[in-house]
């Protein structure tokens, strides 16, 4: 039985892909068979008439996953917009059945699977025949979540609002990770202290441009649940 976790964030460009790659890399370095999946990706680069799923490509390179990164993404769009708008612009109907089928195929190849979301937790994936929000994907795949937040000014507000929304939607939250953390920045230090003292969820950090996570492998494994 595979185990999985979902990576979401307090907003766009917080560092989900960067952290996801480091998580998978850390697990694979100790011979844990960990893979990657993403339901919808926008902003893909076109090379020789082929769209390249940039986030997946980055994760595959950093974590040393073999195979075609595009196979880890159900829907790939060139426009750098929200998935629901990209789908509309390309006349594509996003299907939850396809997402669940693709995820099932991916998880059968690995013992651990790390799923990356799009944007923040409140992200429209499809507004076509099926109305799909990112939260619907998390719940359909029956995954707990890790929340990535920026370490800087404003993160207390953004993080707590994100957590409140997720709890209202009954999405289990395993940890918060403050990205771009600087151990000498008084704002970063205070943000971590406040969140750690006022939440019942573990708070970890990831320094900017780090090639490793300051989280023991044994602890990381605990965040994954059977799926």
Curated annotation (Swiss-Prot):
Cofactor entry: Mg(2+)
GO biological process: biotin biosynthetic process
Pathway listed: Cofactor biosynthesis; biotin biosynthesis; biotin from 7,8-diaminononanoate: step 1/2
GO cellular component, one term: cytosol
Alphabetized Pfam families for the sequence: AAA_26
Keywords per UniProt: ATP-binding, Biotin biosynthesis, Cytoplasm, Ligase, Magnesium, Metal-binding, Nucleotide-binding
Catalytic activity, as annotated: (7R,8S)-7,8-diammoniononanoate + CO2 + ATP = (4R,5S)-dethiobiotin + ADP + phosphate + 3 H(+)
Active site (UniProt): 38
UniProt binding sites for substrate: 42
EC number: 6.3.3.3
Binding site for Mg(2+): 17, 55, 116
Binding site for ATP: 13-18, 55, 116-119, 179-180
Annotated compartments: Cytoplasm
Record has Ligase as a keyword: yes
Class of the enzyme per the UniProt entry, highest EC level: ligase
Cited InterPro entries: DTB_synth_BioD (IPR004472), P-loop_NTPase (IPR027417)
Molecular function as annotated in GO: ATP binding; dethiobiotin synthase activity; magnesium ion binding
Assembly description: Homodimer.
Function: Catalyzes a mechanistically unusual reaction, the ATP-dependent insertion of CO2 between the N7 and N8 nitrogen atoms of 7,8-diaminopelargonic acid (DAPA, also called 7,8-diammoniononanoate) to form a ureido ring.
Family: Belongs to the dethiobiotin synthetase family.
NCBIfam families assigned to the protein according to its UniProt record, in alphabetical order: bioD
Protein name: ATP-dependent dethiobiotin synthetase BioD
Source organism (scientific name): Clostridium botulinum (strain Loch Maree / Type A3)
